[in-house]
Amino acid sequence: MRFGSIGVAVVVAVVAGLACASLASDLRGVVPVIPQASVGLSGWVAVALIWLIAWFLALGVGKLVNTAVGLFAAGCALGVYAMRSGTVLDAAFDAASPTSIAVVSIVYALLAGVLSWSTFAFAGPLPDMPVDPDELPEHGYGAFRPPQLVAALASIATVVAVAVMARTDSKGQAIGAVTLGAMLAAMLARSIRSRTQPVVVFAAPALAIGLVQLVLSFPSGAGFDDDIVRGAVAPILRLMPMDLAAGSLCGVALGYGMTKSGGAEESDDH
């Protein structure tokens, strides 16, 4: 049953990602940043649909298997959409600015946070980790207590990894860099807060990169297509919003999955 549900989720993720991407296409392909998109309303519909499908995948697979697998399935759906969408060059020639890209990245990171929060609330905590009931989503603002935020600080590792690895406009390189960075962040978060459920950590890598993008966007000016052609754009500004959301969800899920028996025990006094 568990493996069957994972297989179905993968198929749904691929089909949904491809179908939604086709709605956001213009003559150059799938537009990566919707607020400046030349595709109009259909682009907004495509983004809304892919996030809705990702949410249902997270809840469904999370309930049948576990929360981490559910969020990984959601990330896969977003990842298929991201792979079909354009690069920073396409965004620039579609009149997107560095600031608008950063703002959309932050919005998508917050959506990933809502998706994570709701999945933990519906499907429950990760089964292989100790649980502090006060930190779970159903206990008011428990997911945002200091231990959660300390674990989320590990997302700094994602920023460093992306700055080192995202050197070209390749979609595979962009998503791969975010995924690997998020994986490292998850492993670090678990090592320093082994008793903290990663409700916030799943979205933290995307949010961290989005905030760095916002800071870097201020000196870049409104249009930056010339900088892209010259290769003068910072690696982090090459990442598109959906790349961040997909890589963050998938990478954190993989990182926690790879460290099931890792992490030092913490004191209960926190």
Across the structure, where does each feature detected by a protein language model lie?
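Membrane-helix interface motif
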Residues: 20-31, 80-92, 172, 214-226
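Hydrophobic cores of alpha-helical transmembrane segments in multi-pass inner/ER membrane proteins
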Residues: 46-57, 104-126, 182-183, 243-259
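N-terminal signal-anchor module of multipass membrane proteins
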Residues: 1-54, 250, 269
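Membrane-interface helix-loop-helix junctions at boundaries between adjacent transmembrane segments
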Residues: 55-141
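Membrane-water interface at loop-to-transmembrane-helix junctions
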Residues: 135-161
